[in-house]
Amino acid sequence: MTQVPNRETPRGIAILARFLASESAGGIVLMVAALAALIVANSPLSAGYFSILHSVWLGLSVELWINDGLMAIFFLMVGLEIKREVLAGGLASWGQRALPGFAAAGGMLVPALIYIAINWGNPQTLSGWAIPAATDIAFALGVLSLLGNRVPTSLKVFLAALAILDDLGAVTIIAFFYSAGLNLPMLAAAFVTLAVLIVMNRLNVRRLLPYLLLGALLWFFVLQSGVHATLAGVALALCIPMGKPEEEARSPLLFLEEKMHYWVAFAVVPIFGFANAGVSLAGITLGNLVDPVPLGVALGLFVGKQIGVFLAAVLAIRAGLAVLPEGSNWVQLYGVAMLCGIGFTMSLFIGNLAFPGSQHLIDEVKVGVLIGSGLAAIAGIVLLRSRFSRP
């Protein structure tokens, strides 16, 4: 008797492959990881969850390995994307950078001002001013992709470019405002390592292994120097050779970016989300939600982002410095500005840097980020699905 082949497994694999290849997959997986963290942190499993995060391995807690180690890989990916877009992508010319550049600047300035206004007079909480200034590129693009062809491709490109420039701004903020207690010998060692990487780039060394080995050494020196270790990822990315457009098939940067994409989207970022979104809601009242930190973060993300991004974009377009994305209208642009308030990954990350050693304030940041990002996602989807956003 001939055995009938089992077609279910290949079909299931095909469905999984299509999901992983979709634009929304990374955002959905991150959303699930964050929701799982919230559930676990408010269940009988919470003691084990927090115990694992605070357990020490090789001198660092698991939480620090995730935030300083795994996130360096995330920032390496961010750096690769920034370099690619600036050299040969959607940010290759000043004209292409204009609208997302102005919008990103407005989208960082206004949320920070709102947070500062709410926390004025409290030096301890004022240090969190940069928390609502960030946009989560995976989350925002994931939500936008759920809308399908309701949103023109030009707006998706605009949001991606804006988020990349936003990430560049966040990296700059971390470098200048959240690095303290410098260890000069280690910092010097980091600069020497970086200099070697730059020389390798100038000599057109195209093998990735030497870059990655020196990158790991650079990460160690930066970690010990007092500068935040994740910046080593960005520095390494900028040293990876891009090559000429006609050499795209042999580009070390494009090869590494392609190989890292799934690991970052479906492992690094979800692990970070699971480790950092868990906050116990026990004892939290409505009164706690209007404390300066969660209120400043939530309003900065939900209100500040949409106002800052949209207002800066309108001023740039009216001044003739930029043009409205092709095939889009003002309502659609405003809907995308709302989605920029999804600040999950980078906002939580900066929150950990702003309030080291204060679990209470970090928990307040988590609450503010979850509320602000959630409201921004819901409002953006509702507006972009409404009849007002149709061309």
Swiss-Prot record:
Its main location: membrane. InterPro entries: Na/H_antiporter_dom_sf, NhaA. GO terms for biological process: regulation of pH. It is a multi-pass membrane protein. Pfam families: Na_H_antiport_1 (PF06965). Gene3D superfamilies: Na+/H+ antiporter like domain (1.20.1530.10). GO terms for cellular component: plasma membrane. It catalyses: Na(+)(in) + 2 H(+)(out) = Na(+)(out) + 2 H(+)(in). It is found in: Cell inner membrane. Keywords: Antiport, Cell inner membrane, Cell membrane, Ion transport, Membrane, Sodium, Sodium transport, Transmembrane, Transmembrane helix, Transport. Na(+)/H(+) antiporter that extrudes sodium in exchange for external protons. PANTHER family: NA(+)_H(+) ANTIPORTER NHAA (PTHR30341:SF0), SODIUM ION/PROTON ANTIPORTER NHAA-RELATED (PTHR30341). Belongs to the NhaA Na(+)/H(+) (TC 2.A.33) antiporter family. This is Na(+)/H(+) antiporter NhaA 1. It comes from Pseudomonas syringae pv. syringae (strain B728a). The lineage of its organism: Bacteria, Pseudomonadati, Pseudomonadota, Gammaproteobacteria, Pseudomonadales.
